[in-house]
A protein has these predicted regions:
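A short, Lys/Arg-rich alpha-helix, primarily the initiator
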Residues: 1-26
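Short, charged recognition helix plus adjacent turn
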Residues: 1-7, 44, 72-79
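Short, basic, alpha-helical segments at the C-terminal edge of helix-turn-helix-like DNA-binding modules
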Residues: 13-16, 59-63
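Residues within the helices of the helix-turn-helix
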Residues: 17, 29-30, 58, 69
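Short alpha-helical DNA-recognition segment
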Residues: 23-44
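Core residues of bacterial helix-turn-helix
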Residues: 35, 63-64
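Short, basic-rich loop-to-helix N-cap that marks the start of a DNA-contacting helix
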Residues: 49-61
Length: 79
């Protein structure tokens, strides 16, 4: 199960990163301000594969102007 969770976190982070690059051209400070968090939090998510709270996840989705469900589409834990 942990392997699946790690895969989900990695995939979600990649999806967010791709949209971040498209919308914010790699400007982590601008993105962090729009999200409402520290730039350090954004760096940790992207560079260190740090997890995120559900609140931060929704703020990130809002800053990327995407429905949160689109970011997690097709991500699931197999039984």
């Amino acid at each position: 199960m942990q392997t699946e969770l790690d895969y989900i976190k990695e995939t979600l982070t990649k999806r967010i990163y791709i949209l971040f690059i498209e919308k914010y051209k790699g400007n982590k400070l601008q993105f962090a301000k729009k999200v409402g968090c520290d730039e350090k939090a954004i760096r940790l998510i992207f560079d260190k594969n740090q997890g995120m709270t559900i609140n931060l996840f929704f703020k990130i989705a809002s800053a990327l102007e995407i429905d949160p469900s689109e970011l997690i589409k097709d991500l699931k834990i197999n039984k």
